[in-house]
From Swiss-Prot:
Keywords: Carbohydrate metabolism, Isomerase, Kelch repeat, Periplasm, Repeat, Signal
Enzyme kind, highest EC tier: isomerase
PANTHER family given in the database record: KELCH PROTEIN (PTHR24412), KELCH-LIKE PROTEIN 28 (PTHR24412:SF441)
Protein name: N-acetylneuraminate epimerase
Gene for this chain: nanM
Residues in the signal sequence: 1-21
Lineage, opening ranks: Bacteria, Pseudomonadati, Pseudomonadota, Gammaproteobacteria, Pasteurellales
């Protein structure tokens, strides 16, 4: 069945080395933890944590203004994922409040066709935990999903909270065991899954050997799938990065260097919700959020320091660049303000940062670009 009404997406950036006036207009509204993708010269973005069901588009060749496209028919969605394949936009999952309980993961898929401005609900669903927390990238007609939270554990948690009926002691008895689980006991998906829209087929592309992730930054270039950081349990991130080679029998992996500690910190706690992309042959990533000190506490056996240890959710602005030869990272600059959980797309040797959020979860509507030539970082 088809639906008509209106779609699109954003993020922010800038650096200490070069900052110029932005060349793209702000979004009509702030969008954080939404979904979007680049299709040809047009970027699409929408949904997310502000509760909007709208999507917007911007023609990057003639970027005068964002246009509202057909409204998403699947209702409000926080943290859905999306990708563009063969001229169409695909949106998967997310979580929403339902009659069953709040924050329920929705396992479904929609296709948007720009040619006639319509949405179609697809007759398919993810075979694993790729509906919330997964990261996606498209290549060769396939959409690759990396990680994702465990569907049963997540939904069950909020169903149990609803059953507690507002009793704070009962809620504490639900949340305490959950947050004290080890990372591996959250059962984030370690599988790499692909979806091929042309055939409506899901495939198992192998396993990510460095623990399941949620909210990692991912990118594909020349048959290589890059994974940067991500959450490994509630409140805990990984500083690790890895590069996978896509083959006919799935993806094989090579461990890369950890992200270095940002200025002012002794240790890199990893980031979730980072935004990155390729520019002039270089991959750069920025933003994201973590709980500084969580990793050190976890290594001491303190599982929920982000909740009980006084740690603060912290958004970041360091910009990291990958050395493709050594597999190591370095900091090449900073944005003028912190950001996370926005859309990043690569276009004309620049990385567009669209929307997102900053300190306190404030949604952002700005669109900025980053470019890096191996020596200088420029933010517009």
């Amino acid at each position: 069945m088809k639906f008509t009404k209106t779609a699109l997406f954003t993020v922010l950036a800038a650096t200490a080395f070069a900052a110029q006036a932005g060349q793209y207009p702000d979004l009509p509204e702030g969008i954080k933890a939404g979904a979007g993708a680049l299709i040809g010269d047009t970027v699409y973005v929408g949904l997310g944590g502000t509760g909007t069901t709208k999507f917007y588009s911007l023609n990057l060749k003639d970027p005068k203004e964002w246009k509202e496209i057909a409204e998403f028919p699947g209702g409000k969605r926080n943290q859905p994922v999306a990708a563009g394949v063969n001229g169409k936009l695909y949106v998967f999952g997310g979580f929403q409040d339902t009659d069953v309980a709040k924050n329920q993961i929705i396992n479904d898929a929609y296709e948007y066709n720009p040619a006639d401005n319509t949405w179609t609900k697809l007759s398919t669903r993810s075979p694993r935990s790729t509906s919330v927390g997964a990261s996606v990238a498209a290549d060769g007609g396939k959409i690759y999903f990396v990680g994702g939270v465990n569907h049963e554990i997540w939904n069950g948690l909020f169903q149990d909270v609803k059953a507690a009926g507002g009793d704070k002691e009962k809620e504490k008895a639900i949340f305490d065991p959950y947050f004290n689980l080890r990372a591996q006991d959250f059962f984030f998906s370690p599988e790499i899954i692909s979806y091929e829209p042309a055939n409506n087929v899901w495939r198992n592309e192998g396993y990510f050997p460095y623990s399941g992730r949620a909210g990692a930054a991912v990118a594909i270039k020349d048959g290589k799938l890059l994974v940067v950081n991500g959450e490994v349990k509630a409140g805990l991130r990984s500083p690790g990065t890895a590069l996978g080679t896509i083959g006919k029998d799935g993806v094989t992996w090579k461990k890369l260097g950890d992200l270095p500690a940002p200025t002012g910190y002794d240790k890199q706690d990893g980031i979730a919700g980072g935004m990155g992309g390729y520019t002039n042959g270089h991959y750069i990533v920025t933003g994201g959020a973590n709980f500084p000190g969580a990793l050190a506490n976890y290594e001491k056996g303190i599982m929920d320091a982000h909740r009980t240890g006084g740690l603060k959710k912290t958004y970041h602005k360091a910009v990291y660049a990958l050395d493709g030869k050594t597999g190591n990272w370095k900091i090449v600059g900073e944005l003028p303000a912190t950001i996370g959980y926005g859309l990043a797309v690569s276009y004309n040797n620049k990385v567009l940062l669209i929307g997102g959020e900053t300190d306190g979860g404030k949604p952002l509507s700005a669109v900025q670009t980053m470019s890096y030539d191996g020596k200088k970082l420029t933010v517009e």
